[in-house]
């Protein structure tokens, strides 16, 4: 049987193809103030984002808690697309629209106007080669955004987001289930926020400062002071880790350590079954101290979670 740290050749082969992304949606910001408006709302620089390129960003409350995470794609000088979890789209659109005031920008739900597909393995590599995460290639109105790769037994499996108008032909390749895509997302160590963990984390608790999701040099945005203070004062005590579990986990589920059985020390962010049937892998955000004491699902006596190597290095506290 494969150990959690060593994935099987069959799983490598499974991560090659095209997946529908029915759980993601699109918000469109259009107008001459679109970039300036979003720059003042999100954790990353939008003003300096070139047309045809993308960035990861967080949309936070005044207390710095993430209300959504977004893949920001600039398709024209006055048009920006925000790809996010569909279960957060309506409330995110409503809150962003509340801040528009006199800005010359219109925020709309554009999910029905765009096709979203996840590309894995050769399908992603053909379009993007060895491009760094968030690099974007435009092809006659369609966009391929390089995502963080899945890492299986020290082998990187390319991942990409394909975004195109509804009239465009779909990308060719073997059809993959959304469950396989979700597992590949877990194994990349980078995920988009979903409703079960709404306002559960500041961006650094999902490692966003280490994967291009936070710009500490940009101006103010909701929650900016909390996010910056956590980084500059070295007060980060929670991070996201990659784990293997013998049992199924659900986003928002509490995780405990026997050293403190009465209080949850971590939260499940995203979980998916391994394609070979050998258990589950998950992203869990928890205290650095508790990671070393052992995590258990649901209760301190629950199934033990095995820490796996994170696929990327964490940015040291500034």
Predicted feature locations:
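A common structural junction motif
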Residues: 45-46, 97-105, 172-181, 259-264, ...
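Anionic-ligand-binding alpha/beta catalytic cores of soluble enzymes and soluble regulatory domains
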Residues: 161-244
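Hydrophobic side chains in well-ordered alpha-helices
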Residues: 37-38, 92-95, 239
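Acidic, proline/glycine-enriched N-terminal capping motif
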Residues: 1-67, 76-77
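Short amphipathic alpha-helix segments
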Residues: 58, 122-140, 248-263
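Acidic, low-complexity central loop/insert segments
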Residues: 17-20, 25-28, 71-188
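Short amphipathic beta-strand starts and helix->beta connectors
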Residues: 6-14, 57-69, 100-103, 137-149, ...
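Glycine-rich, small/acidic residue-mixed loop/short-helix segments
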Residues: 206-213, 228-318
């Amino acid at each position: 049987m494969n150990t959690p740290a060593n994935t099987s050749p069959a799983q490598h082969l499974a991560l090659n193809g095209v997946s529908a992304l029915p759980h993601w949606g699109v918000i469109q910001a259009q107008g001459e103030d679109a970039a300036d408006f979003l720059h003042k709302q999100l954790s990353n620089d939008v003003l300096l984002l070139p047309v045809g390129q993308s960035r990861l960003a967080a949309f936070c409350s005044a207390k710095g808690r993430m209300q959504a995470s977004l893949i920001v794609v600039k398709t024209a000088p006055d048009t920006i697309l925000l790809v996010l979890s569909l279960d957060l789209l309506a409330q995110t659109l409503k809150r962003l629209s509340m801040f528009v005031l006199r800005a010359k920008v219109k925020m709309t739900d554009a999910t029905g106007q765009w096709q979203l597909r996840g590309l894995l393995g050769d399908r992603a590599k053909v379009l993007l080669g060895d491009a760094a995460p968030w690099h974007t290639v435009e092809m006659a109105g369609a966009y391929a955004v390089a995502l963080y790769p899945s890492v299986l037994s020290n082998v990187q499996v390319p991942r990409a987001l394909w975004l195109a108008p509804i009239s465009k032909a779909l990308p060719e390749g073997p059809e993959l289930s959304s469950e396989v895509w979700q597992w590949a997302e877990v194994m990349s160590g980078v995920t988009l926020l979903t409703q079960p963990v709404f306002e559960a984390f500041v961006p650094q608790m999902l490692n966003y400062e280490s994967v291009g999701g936070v710009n500490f040099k940009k101006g103010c945005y909701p929650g900016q002071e909390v996010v910056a203070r956590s980084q500059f004062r070295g007060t980060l005590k929670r991070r996201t880790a990659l784990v293997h579990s013998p049992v199924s986990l659900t986003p928002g589920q509490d995780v405990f350590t026997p050293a403190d059985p009465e209080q949850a020390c971590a939260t499940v962010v995203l979980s998916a079954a391994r394609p070979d049937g050998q258990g589950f892998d998950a992203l869990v955000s928890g205290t650095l101290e508790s990671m070393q004491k052992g995590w258990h699902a649901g209760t301190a006596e629950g199934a033990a979670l095995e820490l796996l190597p994170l696929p990327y290095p964490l940015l040291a506290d500034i």
